[in-house]
C-alpha cells in the first residue's frame, strides 16, 4: 500500500466534499450573470418588463464590479427605451456613464440621444450624438448618428418657429 498516494486521495476527496458544503461565491456570481444574460435574451425576445426585472435582480450582486454594473444599467436603459419610459431610460444610461465617464461608449451616447429625441429634447439629443461619434462607432453608425443630428437640428428649428 502506497501511503502517500492514499493520503492524497483522502485529501482530494475531502476538498471535493468541502466545495459541495460551502459553495464558492463564483456559483453565486454565475447565478447573477445568468440573470443578466436572461435579461439580454428577454430584450431580444421583446419581453422588456421581464428583462428589466432580471437586470434589477442581477444589479445588487455586482456592486464591486464596475464593468458589470455598467452593462446592467445599459441593459436597463434599453429595456426602459422599448417600454417607452424615456426619462427612466436616460437616467439608467446616465448612471452607467457616471461610473467611468472616460470609458463611455458611443453606442450608449447614441441610445441616450435617441431617448432624448423621443422626449422632444432635441438639443440634448444633438449633444449626445455629437459626443458619440468619436467613441468607437462604426462607419455606418457614424453615418446614422450624423443623420440623427441633421434631423434633430431640423426639429429644433421647427420648435423655435412654434414657440414664437
Language model features with spans:
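TPR/TPR-like (Sel1-like) alpha-helical repeat modules
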Residues: 117-140, 147-154
